[in-house]
Every structure is written in C-alpha cells, then in structure tokens.
Amino acid sequence: MTFLPEPPHVHGAAPSSPTTAVLLCNLGTPDEPTAPALRRYLAEFLSDPRVVEIPRLLWWLILHGIILRVRPKKSAAKYASIWLPEGSPLKAWTVKQGRLLAGYLGQRGHRVAVDCAMRYGSPSVASVLDAMKAAGVTRVLVLPLYPQYSGPTTASVVDAVAAWAQRTRALPELRFVNRYHDDPGYIGALAHSVLDHWRTHGRPDRPCAAAPRGSPSAGMARAQRLDNRMHRTWARTAQIRCSEPNPKPSRAHAP
C-alpha cells in the first residue's frame, strides 16, 4: 500500500489556522448539467454497493448496459432546469450551510474550521480531508447531512473517510455524527421553520405533509427502521408546533 507523503514537522511552531474542523458531507452532484457530467456522477454513485445491494456482476451489466446509456441525457435536462448561477443547488446550499455554521461557531468564540464535501462528485471527501490535514487540522468531526441513519447515506460517508484513512500515515482524530433525527435542537429548528413560514404566508387549510425519499423494497426491514425514524422526527416536530401556538421567532435560522 502506498501512503500519502507527510510534510516535515517543525518543532515549536504554533498553528496559524484552527486545528479542529467540522466536515459537512452531502450526497453529491454532477459538476455541470450535461450528459457527460451526469454519466460520470451516476457511474460513481450507482457503483457504490451501499446504494445498490444486488450481485455486482448483474448490476454492472444493468448499469453500464442500460442506465448509463439512457439516463444521463434525461437527467441532464432536469438538472439544467434547476441549475443556479453559482452552480448545483445542492452544492450551493451546502456551502451556505457551512458558512453559516462557521459564523455561528466563530461568534461564540470557537476556533473551528468548517468545510463541505460531496460523497459522490466534487469536492470529494478525500480531497477536503487532504486540504484539512495540509492546513494543520488534527481533529475532525464528520457530519453527514442526513438526520436519519441509513447505510446508503451515512455509512457510505464513513466508507469514504475510511478509504482516505487507509492511505494516510498520520491520521487526525476522527469523530462521526451517526444520526440526529431526534435531537432537540434539530427538532426545534424544523418546527420553527414551519412556524416562521406560517407567520409570513398564513397557516394553510390543509395539513402539512412530509415526503421523505423512499428506500428500495429489497431492503424492507432496513427501510422500515428508516421509516420509523422519519415518523419520530415529524411527530416530535408536530408536538412543538401544536404546543406553541405563539412561539418566539427563531434565531436567524442559525445551525
């Protein structure tokens, strides 16, 4: 195994940048809304055994024989319809989240670097971890941006970090946030986002509906556990909405 080269250590040198960092990891996005870019992105995404749990040979034939020949062009048109001037909406909003979190921590006196990575596409998890390490970071909190734990999402991020760690000699201290679907801060933020919207636009006549992304039927037991966590998240959010008819405004939507 070949390891990445390590920079020479300078004794007594004080770090000029934060040595603790938060790595926000989102699912991923193509680099641009074109068929070639979608083909690269889908090939990486759909080749992950965490995402598609069927025999590898069978899936390889389906993926390369059918999906990557047909889907990129269709998906590119859909991406183009939502593409922002600053790029992919998912990447743009993830970067904005990172900036808000960095500002929130900085205002409270925490000297912490915050950066973002995509599990599939760019910037990759490995490239961002390389940059953090080169900047002198020695402690990293990895935060997959999925409230409910799931193998194709959260565990796949852990896989990417582990793959980077395998080729790195001097590892930083690594910690992972596994799930936060029932964290009081997260639940409160969800509830206040709904309530803030109601204050501005009025309360709708019909009930609110939560529509999480589905799971493959082949893993129904695993999907049921994810579904239960989704229900708990929404039930606790609804409790706050019902118990606070006139709640105080949320604080600037900070993380």
List PLM regions with ranges:
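Active-site-proximal alpha-helix that buttresses catalytic centers in soluble enzyme cores
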Residues: 2-255
